[in-house]
Structures are given as C-alpha cells and as structure tokens.
C-alpha cells in the first residue's frame, strides 16, 4: 500500500483524490475547462509514474513536482503556472505560521516542565526569572534563525547537523577581562550610569569586582574571567595593612557576591578566576597599582600578601556555604609551573584539601603543554605576522585570557555526519562543507555583534574593550566516539587504535582548515574547541534517534546521548592512565576549551593524594588542563557527605548529589535527561588500581609530593627514570628493558606505571636506535623484554609485566 510522508514527518495513506482535487482547483482558477475523465485519468497515470518512492513511501514534494511536470507537458501552461503560484502561496503561509511562536505551548511547556529545555542549562533553576529567559530566548532564537542566518545555516541547526550556541541571546559568548584595568580606572565610562573611582581598599575592590562581573555578564552569553587574581589583589593587603581576618572578610564578600543570582534567568554570573600562586615573571618587577596609582613597591614584593589572599580564598571555598554546599563560582584555575613548590606548606595543604573534597579548581599544565603563564596576558598585544598561525585561547576551560574570548561557538554533530556518509572520502568532503558553513555563520555573527557594539547595545563592553578583534570564532565538535561507531569504514569505538588514529587525523585536518579561514576572513581569529555540550550532546542524540532509529548513540538501552567531544565512552575504563594515554593524543590539538576530568567516586583520602595525582599528570602528559572531580552529597541537616548518597546515611532525608556536569558542579537532579543518563553510565577512576596512590603513608606521601619534578627527556635516559628512594622492583633474574619511541603516549604510560611501582628498568629509544629494533624484531612499542627473553608488547605491556612479577613488587614495598 502506497503511503505519503507529509512535511511534518508523519506518514499517511496515499489518496489520489487529493491530487485530482488540487488539479481541478488550478483549472478553475485560470478559467480553463476541466478535461474529461479519459484525459484526466491519463494525466494521473503519468503523475503516478513520475512520483519517486522509497520503501513504498512517497514524499509530498515529489507528488507536487510530478503534478507540475505533467500539467506543463500536457500543454496546460497557464494551469501549471497557477498550480505553482498556489503551491508557493501555501508555502509562504506555512513558513509564516512556523515563524509565529505558539505562546501557549511555550509558557505551559515551561510551567508544566514538559519541555526538556527547562533543564537545558543546569545553572538556570525553575523560577520566574527562568520563565522570562525561556520566553525571551525563544523570540531571540527565532530572530537569529529567521532574520540573520541564511537558510542553509538555519536548516542545518534545525536538523541537528550543527548547533548554534546561545541563540537565545543577542550577545557574544565569553570574555576575559583585564583586572589591572579595573584597578586603574574603576567602574565608569558609560554615560548616564553611576561611576566609581579606582578602589583604594581591598574591600572596595572586592565589591567593584562583583559589580563588574555582574554588569558584564548581562552583556555576554557565557563565562566572564579575571586573570592573576591573587597577584593583583595582594598590594591592597599591603597598603591596607590588613591582618588575615580582614583579608578573609573581603574575599568572603567577593565569593558570596558572585554566587548571588544577578543575571538573566535568575542565575549567578558564570565566573572564572585564574590564580598565579607564585608571582609571574612578567609581573614580578612591575610597580604595583593601588587606587589607580603606582606604588613604591613591585608585585614581586607582595608574595606574603599573595599567600594570604590564596589562603583566604581556599578556606572559604572549602568551608562551603551554611549547609556545607560547595560554591559554584568562581571556578578557580591554578597554574602548575615547573617551579611550583610541592613541599608541605599550609597553602599547598589547603589547596589540595579543597581539590580532594570538592574538586573545585582546574589546573593549568605549564609543565608539559605548549602554554606559557604569560600567554594569558599577551594575547591582546601580539602582532599576527602569520595569518595561518593558530593561537590558543588561554585562561582555563570556561575562562579566557585578558581582553580576549570568543564571539560565538558552533558545534558539529559528528555521529550524524558519519552516519550519512558511505565512505571515508565522502566524510572528508562533507566535514569540509560543514566547517565552511560554521565559519560563515561565525563570520555573520561577528559582523552582527560588532555592529551592535558600535551601536551601543553593550555599553560597558564598549567602554572596557572597544572591539572584538582579539576574540575568537569557535568551532566545536561533539560525539567523536559515536562518530567512529557509525562510520561504515570503522565501526569501532575510541578504545581501538584505528579509531584513535582516525580522530587524530580529523583534528589535524580541522586545524588546517581553521588556518584557511584565518586567511579567508582575516583578521578574524578561529579556534577549535572540545565543546562542553551540556545540552547539545543530548539534543543531537535525541533528534538523531528520532530521525535515524538505527544510529548508534552512547546509550542504546536508555536515554540517548553522545559522548562529549573526543572523550572516551564514560563507562570504558576505571584506569586513569588508560584514559590519559588516549586523551594526550587529542587534547593538545584543540586550541580552545579542553580539559581532562578525573572523575572519582568520592573525595580522596588526604591532600597528599590529590597533590600527587595532579603532579603525576602534569609531569607526564601534555594535555593543557586537568581537574580532580569527586562526587559528594549535601544533607540539609548534616551537610557534606563524601560520595553519592541520594538519601542521607545518617537521617535518611533526601540529599543533593553533586558532580561535575561538563565543567562545573551542579546537583545531579538539575541535569537534563541525557546528562543524567551519562552520570548513571559513568565509570569513576580507581586511582588505587592505577597506582597513583600507592605508598601514600605520611612519610612516603611527603617524599612523593616534596620531590622536584623529574624532567622527562626525549632520550629516556635511565638516570631520569628511577625517582625512588625505596628498594626498586626487579625481575627475579635481573632488570627488564623497555623499548620505546618518541611521541608515543602508550610508552609514556608504561614508563609512568613502572616509576610509580618503583620498577628499576633500562630504556632503549627505538627512534634513535632502529638498528637494535630491527635486530630484535621489535615492531611495536612499548615492548618490555626480560633477561630470560620473555616479551610484553603493546599498551598493556607494563600491566602485564607487573602482574607477572607481582611477588617481587610486593616484596619491594
């Protein structure tokens, strides 16, 4: 039985009478006599022959195309024109109706919580402010899609091939601000608004920062950031001659202030601060500024006061609010440099206690990544002599360096793209086209928001920034793992080497294309982001599963969602080093937001464990940012509880379970259905099994944290390997030899396991000694060979060796 697919996707029985009726209307409209039954039936037979069917289903547009063609070929040209005119009129009516919002559905969908978008953003609670944001956002999104973007961009968004972020706001995305500029100028520059002179006291500055971030958040869609928070505040402590109690009171007012709902949707400003911990080299000799005036001392003279700021900040963040709930904002990012002092100090202990308990901070890896601490302040000062050079947007996952940021983000639905391609060649062709569309849409948005900036729609941004020339156009991606599953030329997830190689190839391909866009749209900047995809991962999968029932998602038996960016499936491994080895191939290739989240089931046992984990990662991996992310719960009566407890284990009252949703902590009950399913599927990392926390007794822990970082050398010299002051592990009959090569993440992971487990071993770098590799027939690294000739090959080599020599390892400890 022939069926018809209507424009809304519904399928109905075919009714030939409707074709006959439509044709008769066209004849009458032109005054042309309706043909007799014989002619009419012959025309209908020709129409049926022209209709394109698939699985006995015909598209409504195919029927109408066939009617037009038959009328014209039968000599009824005026009737055909009338039919085309009528068809276009109906199309215009449909489009006009589609552009008019169903206000009843919109409002009731929010009030009755029927629309999944009620939980689209976990920071927006069910409130009157949330309703107002929902209503205004729907209007603004229609404006972007109907009036600004071209039809292809709008249609690709509607089809979930791409996601245009922040359509609900006629504003740029995220920004990093120059805190020193605020210190020098105060809050002013906008006509008709109250102005404030530069702050002369720490308490005043803290209030100004709260006000400034709140003001700017209402002119931007995303995160607002300050850099060198502790460095710039320290001189105020010195000139005020504040004791610790006074410092803590000021910092407390700042933290509570930025957590007060003051932006659209009854949200707190989405804020990020970067803390230097030690005075940066490029600021050390600069004269400190207080009250807009240079002082007779430098920032480098204020290390003592800087420590007071850091101590106060961490203590308040660790104490949490009155019910033990961790503060959502600001998200702090700490700089881990080569000269970071890992010794047991009061502030180190506090920092890593906060990390172990709440997972609050992010850590910037300035040890092994391609970033430098000064980059956060130098972006706006660089001359772009090479248009193809890709810059990195510094400042943390949700932050940005001083006077830089992003004007917008467009994310590509990789699983849908792969699903619709028959071959790898077709994939590259369609990926290029999709990126072209994204780049053009971002170019359009930049022109729009720049015009609105000049028109005065963002008055404070105009006063403090002036232009968006140092702000990036950001292209993101989602569902790399499911892309590999749906790719007909792969068909395997990211735990397989073939898929990892393909993703690495894709990221490099995308980077090269971004360089092309920087030349084409010069002087605009482009970057590549591992999109957080809080709602996008769910929206993409939900849409795709409805449209393509056999497409593979991250969960085939529950609520569908896609894995964020190019992350491993959330339930893949409990070994943090397995995940790190894979992500170390991908994350350094992004030039915008990306982070490795170390998800833990509950708080780490002590601060030394957290410090050792962070140090191990930054010493041995190139990925730019890392977080330690324990799950915790909050009872209204008993406060903080380690781990996941939806009911308090003491009083059985309902408790809030907190975990990191994409980059920040929110109650799991506020997550959308897709992210809630991801939380259920998530396998947390067992750091004990990974070996990170072995020998964490008081003395051993202090030694592990207090030792300076071992510098990994490209020649992998044996002298740099044995970083142990305890008896090394040996095979029963001697020392094993590990054969590695340059730039091999699996080799690095194998060496790291040996170091942590105190294994004494030799290293041969096959990149420099191919003759030895050929002689021994070594075709894969890492390869570990015992003196008796036993071989352990591939990414599991170190684990296999440790298992085979378990008794020796136990004796050594």
What are the roles of these predicted feature ranges?
Residues 69-72, 276-277, 462-483:
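Core structural elements
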Residues 1, 774-785:
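Structural micro-motif
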Residues 723-759:
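Local sequence-structure signature of Cys/Sec-based thiol-disulfide redox active-site neighborhoods
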Residues 646-712:
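Long insertion/accessory domains within large nucleic-acid-processing enzymes
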Residues 787-813:
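Non-catalytic, surface beta->alpha helical segment in thiol-disulfide oxidoreductase systems
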